[in-house]
Amino acid sequence: MKRTVAIVLVVTLALVALLASCSGNTATEAAGEAIGVSRAVQNWSLWEPMNSFNSGVWNKADWTNGGMFNCGWKPDHAYFSNGQLVLKLDNVSSHGRPYTSGEYRTNNTFSYGTFEVNMKAARGSGTVTSFFTYTGSPWDEIDVEILGKDTRKVQFNYYVNGVGGHEKVIDLGFDAAAGFHKYSIEYGNGYINWYVDGQWKWGVNNNGMNAPKGAAMPSRPMQIMVNLWPGTGVDSWLGRFNYSGPLYAYYDYVKYTPK
């Protein structure tokens, strides 16, 4: 569906005035040096149909995370077609890895609120299609991951100071690689809720819901990130990756609403 090219940023009056005066890394484990010098911006509402690349809001990765991530991420593998962001995974070698794929992330970080994506996952054993939030060091992260070995399930996870191990796999009741669906993360002070197509699927909090009472929860502003990658050495988790041709993940829009 053709969509209007638009980015709406709703900010506080003080920030608007400032802008006007200046005008003229599940185990997704996204990434250390990829984060750079992003700024924490806590008052924006972000709505972006994925029609075209806006370097003022987003950047395309050009690096590799190494380890279990058996690809390099290159800018030309994150491109726009038919009103969607497309991440392509193929067997072009890059950054010392045998495969190349795409990773797309915001320049700024966002605090408590709801993060939403409308996406269609790639299908293929050994792969992960992701939507997640990430801080850099110290490492907090909240994940939505579709494992290509079974695209009728979704895996949720979170990290606090680099400690994960909170995976929860949920049956979707549909094939995430067959069409677009909405996945949302509600991130608050001491809690996280995950939704699919507007329906609550899983949640944790520090008051004893699916986590010990008093458990540490993510608390820092985070970048919004999406990527597609093949695994290596993690066959028991992802299944074995055997390349048989390019794979694609599609993203229709990303939305953030602050609390």
Model-identified regions with their sequence ranges:
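GH16 jelly-roll
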Residues: 29-259
